[in-house]
Amino acid sequence: MPENPAPDKLQVLQVLDRLKMKLQEKGDTSQNEKLSLFYETLQSPLFNQILTLQQSIKQLKGQLSHIPSDCSTNFDFSRKGLLVFTDSAITNGNAQRPSNNLTVSGLFPWTPKSGNEDFNSVIQQMAQGRQIEYIDIERPSTGGLGFSVVALRSQNLGEVDIFVKEVQPGSIADRDQRLRENDQILAINHTPLDQNISHQQAIALLQQTTGSLHLVVAREPVHTKSRTSINLTDTTMPETVHWGHIEDVELINDGSGLGFGIVGGKSSGVVVRTIVPGGLADRDGRLQTGDHILKIGDTDVQGMTSEQVAQVLRNCGNSVRMLVARDPVGETSVTPPTPAALPVALPAVANRSPSTDSSLYETYGVELIKKDGQSLGIRIVGYIGTAHTGEASGIYVKSIIPGSAAYHNGQIQVNDKIVAVDGVNIQGFTNQDVVEVLRNAGQVVHLTLVRRKMCSSTSPLERSSDRGTVVEPSGTPARYVTGAVETETNLDGGDEETEERMDNLKNDNIQALEKLERVPDSPENELKSRWENLLGPDYEVMVATLDTQIADDAELQKYSKLLPIHTLRLGMEVDSFDGHHYISSIAPGGPVDALNLLQPEDELLEVNGVQLYGKSRREAVSFLKEVPPPFTLVCCRRLFDDEASVDEPRTTETLLPEMEADHNVDINTEEEEEEELALWSPEVKIVELVKDHKGLGFSILDYQDPLDPTRSVIVIRSLVANGVAEKGGELLPGDRLVSVNEYCLENTTLAEAVEVLKAVPPGIVHLGVCKPLVDNDKEEESHYILHSNNNEDETELSETIHDINSSLILEAPKGFRDEPYYKEELVDEPFLDLGKAFQSQQKEIDNSKEAWEMQEFLPPRLQEMGEEREMLVDEECDLYQDHFQSMDLYPSSHLQEAAPVSSVKELHFGTQWLHDSEPPELQEARSMMNMYSQETQQYGYSTENMIKENFGIDSLPSISSSEGNSQQGRFDDLENLNSLTKSSLDLGMMIPNDVQGPGMLVELPAVAQRREQEDLPLYQLPRTRVVSKASAYTGASSSRYTAGACELPEREEGEGEETPNFSHWGPPRIVEIFREPNVSLGISIVGGQTVIKRLKNGEELKGIFIKQVLEDSPAGKTNALKTGDKILEVSGVDLQNASHREAVEAIKNAGNPVVFVVQSLSSTPRVIPSVHNKANKIANNQDQNTEEKKEKRQGTPPPPMKLPPPYKAPSDDSDENEEEYAFTNKKIRQRYADLPGELHIIELEKDKNGLGLSLAGNKDRSRMSIFVVGINPEGPAATDGRMRIGDELLEINNQILYGRSHQNASAVIKTAPSKVKLVFIRNEDAVNQMAVAPFPVPSSSPSSLEDQSGTEPVSSEEDGSLEVGIKQLPENESSKLEDISQVAGQGMVAGQQKALDCPTDNAVSQMKPQKYSTKVSFSSQEIPLAPAPSYHSTDVDFTSYGGFQAPLSVDPATCPIVPGQEMIIEISKGRSGLGLSIVGGRDTPLDAIVIHEVYEEGAAARDGRLWAGDQILEVNGIDLRSASHEEAITALRQTPQKVRLVVYRDEAHYRDEENLEIFPVDLQKKAGRGLGLSIVGKRNGSGVFISDIVKGGAADLDRRLIQGDQILSVNGEDMRNASQETVATVLKCAQGLVQLEIGRLRAGSWTSSRKTSQNSQGSQHSTHSSFHPSLAPVITSLQNLVGTKRATDPSLKSSGMDMGPRTVEIIRELSDALGISIAGGKGSPLGDIPIFIAMIQASGVAARTQKLKVGDRIVSINGQPLDGLSHADVVNLLKNAYGRIILQVVADTNISAIATQLENMSTGYHLGSPTAEHHPEDTEEPLQMTAG
């Protein structure tokens, strides 16, 4: 039977919880039922009663032998199982009373009858001469006894004494008037509280008593009448203490704060902990450290916690009046308690004993008295030394907390060694053991310490460092101290231990600062020396003075107006952690940046004499906002990491053996808590790889260190198929890389880690890796550091890298280095980095040697650690410096000015084709490129194959020259949204950075004409003008190409890199350009059969693109072509897969006019229509291949080609294949042996639509997984039958996908050959991890339709039939569906090669006359309703005709925002941020991202198009329709220089008041507390809004207010035009009931706006009035349906979609419009389908309920069923319904789809129009006309 049933039961429950979690993670659900049953049994009341009864029986047996002869043995058991004794009579002083049943916790009572000498003697002994009182209190049937107790440990024998802490006024105990505060309870119900009774048992005795409570108490003689000043926390002095000094202090807050800090608790009182030097309290002079705060204003704060007192202070306003007390007096002088968790000391008895070692050491004893919940006030540190330096081992005093018991004692000094605690020798104990001994010690602690005789006393400065600086014990060799494993421990106890520790850490420096003596010197030197003394030698202190004149905030703001105002003032952002404030980023060009002194990760200590160190972030930021210039900043920078801090203990290499042998590595409690965050095992495993000419065969990324957000770690991202790492089998993706040979990678950036890996010579490489922790098993903690990161080591490392890679490293431009926001970099395709070696002297180049190194450039400093960045470190070529000796093409200044491109660039090399007449520089450049070509041949590849297979490039441009077929080498700097390049290498030549700016067009008259005869490609098509002689050897300068926008941005230095997820190509359009005599067309082109840019999903941009358009040229005059447009066709010649040369020739040979078919990038995915017109027809002389190419291309965007990682195609040799297959399968099974589940390896044959798989990611966005969520019944996967829904893909064709996104898998499937090898694992728990629930009907279901959810054959007259399975998906807010090509959110068949050839509304207007016949089938299997109504499978045939001329696209940079339509706009940020403030998000009732304010100094205000109230739907392709508030802020913060937004402006949202839903909120403001909310005012205009709601406050408990609500009035006083300060003052001064009038943006209107605007942009009407608008196929409706299902309905959030009926109540006045449009009914053209809501108007009363949705089926109106009613009947019902209208509705997926279709059809008609002549309910006629 358990000794302690309750704790044991709790422990078993915790073990069960952990066991269930582990089984769930492994996917094992077989034991769930048993575990649940076990869990329920343990928690059942019956089981608890059995436990209690067993315990009572055991206790009874133990007591029976001790029953006195005169004691009653009558006992019973209560219903709960407790032991109950019955006594006949008890003695209470002189009174005799009958006894009730007394429940005691199994402890036998001793009744104090006359003659019971045993009981009386025990009581007398416990009273120790004090007055004894016998008290009886009748316990009421309800409520408590009215007093509280506190348990304190006494000095003798470590007993726990119970004292009365407080008697509540008016309670039973108070009315009895016998029980008093400070009484010690000696016995409860005749049970003496001696050493046999624990504290918990005593409390149980009090709580479980029924009837009368019999107490025996001991009381000291009363010395004072003061009850409020009794000190309850010192058992050695229970006498009352009253204060020697009480003072009334009044402080007037000047805005800078009160200037003092408080700590404490209910038991010890709240005391002044610190006084800020120079602060208000310090200047006033009356308040002192240690003062007890008794009263604030009229509020008695005794018994409050420090947080409650702080709230009272905050509510006081500007004037704060306090009653404080100090210097308690009584029989004994007692130091008043300082902070709650700090000890209060009595004068210690000095027991200095004779020195044990008269020559070196003296031993002395110290007695410290600590109070309950408080510490001794010392920090200890443990040193691990060797045998011959015993003095370096042991526990030493590291620092002493000012005001603590140790501090007041005065005998303990820093560096004293603790040898014994209460007589227990602690030598040889670990830190943790010593901590436990000290914490478990009694009230009086006897310490025995040893001190070196010649040790001088340390200064307060040495005691005060909490930054990990260890003061070296005298006589201890330095090398052991710096390498010590140090665990700094604060010896706290009680509930406030953590708070106390943090308070102590924050305030050490404050205490030390008070004791510093000023040295006459310059202010800067004085500050510097003061902080240097304080921090020690490990930190460099910097003093910066900024005498700024802030003329314009816009000049300082570089990123976003969402950054706080202090960033504008100082030009830097600050991150705060536990009182430390670190510079996280520095704005380029800002005041701090101009100093060139500070850098990110420096800590900000002080500003203008006010110390920020130790302050909260709110205090620090508030101060930085207000502090006036000039600014004097004091910052520090850590110099070394030799010494471990408290939070990260580690040791240097020299001590590693001792640590491993001893296993006594000390960890404090904070570190144990942090271990829960660790992702990797602390054990370092050494992996040996042999580096060959291809590299190590893995790629890396950096990842935020979970234990330290300011650092990053290097993680293996993926392995190259058949690479060195994969063959070794010991490395896996996710392993943490900590060292390479002797180089430690701790605290290195990603770029530095890549350089280290590249610098390693071929041969054996030793990698230190940490494996990920599995199943939360925590191994034995051991700390390590492989290489000491001091300055000397860093210098050595950088010099080594420089020696090896001196020709690779190009200095990053300063602006780029300071950019704080980075995105993931796909760098599997390196670019050529031209380094310093180009400046060296000329020397002959040996063509046989390897000459080129391909690498990715990334800035050396990465400020933002939250994002992942990756680099490829394989496919290396050995580098020899002498290969570059002759490449002094241009002066060094050009090279240093040229900024490397931080995105992926392509590089091709060919054979030498230049003539001798060319300049030598060109020949040299060409020869170097040839070397690379020869080098790749040595590997067994042709240049083309190598680049094709390893870098994802399909082919190289083939050029016919006089020397035979060769490959042209060129290097086009195509820049995406964030590229920084100012240089280019074109036709194998360097271009100086100063050539008349980027994008300049250059003609080459002499060289160009000569090359024309050789059929060489030229970028400039016409012939005559010379633009610049300075660039006579250049083909073209830097081009700009945007992978996510229609127009390429002007890019500034300092902007970061962003790689879009996927491209969204707009529809093809036709542009005609008429030639002019002797004038060029004015365009330059770039591209060809080469991959230009790889996107995040693996898609590769490839083709012919417009590089630049001259303004005054024929092309420029059309205003139809832009940089970045893709040319699909020129005058009938298809350029989709043309080489660069073919494109040039096609343009040259085109007639007049030149007819281009081009595409521009769009920010949203669209289904692209076919394009057929006269310009598209195939020329008679085109061969059949060209015709086939053209048909393949019709209307489709370029398909993704290859994944980023290099992929080597399998060998053709069948024998080798068999052997390698077996070997590979074995390796695969070894690689994934640790993963839970069943591993499968299969091969499938793709068909024309791919594999027939739909993929999705993990529900947990922090984990990358690829799950199968749907299998097309007609696809290869379903035919094979081995794959199931829920399988997780690990590899495709030896390409490791484990740990990558599902977009990557899709891209691999699409580009894979016909035979696909899949490795996947099957886990039962996978369904719970998938981001998207499996499609409802599996392929094996007999009820499934032909294609599971309906197919959509789309036929056109000229294209063949194309069939694709579209799945209607259940709503899931966290879904991240596979997005194949241009179809968003529909889970299309993965591997589909063609985009669906369906027009959207927008695309219809841009098509030539053509005919579509679209059959739409709605799947009934999606609706789990029984019985299924007949309308579930309605077929609707739509036929549309259109004859529209394709218009030119609207320029998003200038187009106005049309209300009621989704608009795409572009805004260039310039030198400021966007300047937007937003509200809303899916996690708020607003459920949409809405602009709250447009700041006048921001880019949006300068642009002038965005208004407050506009809804933001997308930001640079990131969909915000279902984003949370934080996700939207993140997306807006990380925008590049040119921002592309999709916005929607509701037509009804022109008048502010109309947008608001106004409602009253009454909050009860309690005395001493606020309302629990923060407010903020608009910078421009009026209005005060709620910015934050405090947890636990009145507003939070009320649960009606949200962030973004506007306060319209307070207690009837209008606040619409009031300032923030006015509203704050009114709210602070309000008392009691506070009546607020709140305005909130209507959520219904935004929801409706989003729904009705899905396809509004660009929707066209037929030019023939007899035809209705063209209807988009239902795929667009399904897309809209998925997009419009929102989490507004709580049922959706919990279970996907609530199919049950809902009752909606609408209050409608006579003048109100109901605001809904209905469709359906008996006899409807849509069929006899039920009445459903077709539209909801934002301005109607129905929208205000926020409970109705488009597509809801109306079951009844005011109780009248609608079954069998016609449309007109229901319209009349609604028209005549006023007052209280009760609608019963039900959500229906099929109805929703039809409703959404009708929305699309009705665009442009009167639906919801406020100007409609008839009621909005009556909308059937136009709907019928449209649908007919």
From Swiss-Prot:
Gene that specifies this protein: PATJ
Q: List the residue ranges of the region (Disordered).
A: 1168-1220, 1333-1362, 1645-1669, 1805-1828
Species for this entry: Canis lupus familiaris
Question: At which residues is Phosphoserine found?
Answer: S459, S522, S645, S1211
Q: How does it sit in the membrane?
A: Peripheral membrane protein
Q: Where in the cell is it found?
A: Cell junction, Tight junction; Apical cell membrane; Cytoplasm, Perinuclear region
Q: What is its main location?
A: other
What's said on domains? Answer: The L27 domain (also called Maguk recruitment domain) is required for interaction with PALS1 and CRB3, and PALS1 localization to tight junctions. The PDZ domain 6 mediates interaction with the C-terminus of TJP3 and is crucial for localization to the tight junctions. The PDZ domain 8 interacts with CLDN1 but is not required for proper localization.
Q: What region holds the L27 domain?
A: 5-65
Pfam families registered for this protein in UniProt: L27_2 (PF09045), PDZ (PF00595)
Give Gene Ontology CC terms.
Answer: apical part of cell; apical plasma membrane; bicellular tight junction; cell leading edge; cytoplasm; perinuclear region of cytoplasm; plasma membrane; tight junction
User: Tell me, what does this protein do in biology?
Assistant: Scaffolding protein that facilitates the localization of proteins to the cell membrane. Required for the correct formation of tight junctions and epithelial apico-basal polarity. Acts (via its L27 domain) as an apical connector and elongation factor for multistranded TJP1/ZO1 condensates that form a tight junction belt, thereby required for the formation of the tight junction-mediated cell barrier. Positively regulates epithelial cell microtubule elongation and cell migration, possibly via facilitating localization of PRKCI/aPKC and PAR3D/PAR3 at the leading edge of migrating cells.
- Where in the numbering of this chain does the PDZ domain appear? 134-221, 248-328, 365-453, 553-639, 686-758, 1070-1162, 1241-1324, 1464-1547, 1560-1642, 1703-1789
Q: Which UniProt keywords apply?
A: Cell junction, Cell membrane, Cytoplasm, Membrane, Phosphoprotein, Repeat, Tight junction
**Pro residues compositional bias, start-end:** 1196-1208
The modified positions for Phosphothreonine read T1535
Comp. bias (Polar residues) = 1345-1354, 1645-1668
Q: How does it assemble?
A: Forms a ternary complex with PALS1 and CRB1. Component of a complex whose core is composed of ARHGAP17, AMOT, PALS1, INADL/PATJ and PARD3/PAR3. Forms a heterotrimeric complex composed of MMP5, LIN7B and PATJ; the N-terminal L27 domain of PALS1 interacts with the L27 domain of PATJ and the C-terminal L27 domain of PALS1 interacts with the L27 domain of LIN7B. Component of a complex composed of CRB3, PALS1 and PATJ. As part of the Crumbs complex; interacts with WWP1, the interaction is enhanced by AMOTL2 and facilitates WWP1 localization to the plasma membrane.
Biological process GO terms, please? establishment of apical/basal cell polarity; microtubule organizing center organization; positive regulation of epithelial cell migration; regulation of microtubule cytoskeleton organization; regulation of protein localization; tight junction assembly
Q: What is this protein called?
A: InaD-like protein
Q: Which InterPro entries match?
A: L27_2, L27_dom, L27_dom_sf, PDZ, PDZ_scaffold, PDZ_sf
